[in-house]
Amino acid sequence: MEDHKLKIIHKALQGHKDAIDFVVHLSTIARAWDDIIDKDKGIDDDRINRAFWIALVEIPQNPFYQQHLFQITPLIRDYINSWLDANNMEQGASDHNKHVAFVLRDLIGNIVMQCAYLIGGYEWMRTVSPWVRSFQFEERLDKYMEGLTHGNI
């Protein structure tokens, strides 16, 4: 994960190590899964193995995840469903559907905001929400559309 994103996550999650680890691990899995499905970037066996290890060993053992399992699991389910929808909507779709896919594919940031809520409550979530959205949607729509055209999204 890029340093500037990690700094925002660290601040949004008030330095809560287990919450930060959870979000970083979830991001690692999401990036690997996306690269496997999109086939737009090479992904080596070590990265695939690491993603599966994180999913099956490290996240289930994470104390933050364990404590908030029933609040977090529906968010992960919704994020994965949105990401699957985005992948389908990108395929030969109208520009409108591609614009919708552009938003759906990055909803993992919503999980960060909910983790912030679990750590600091409503006021804290509302404080960090603009920062999180600033990196959640940092990619520009025109670059995304260009990437779809050239097959590198």
Where are these regions (language model features)?
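All-alpha prenyltransferase/terpene-synthase fold signal
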Residues: M1-I153
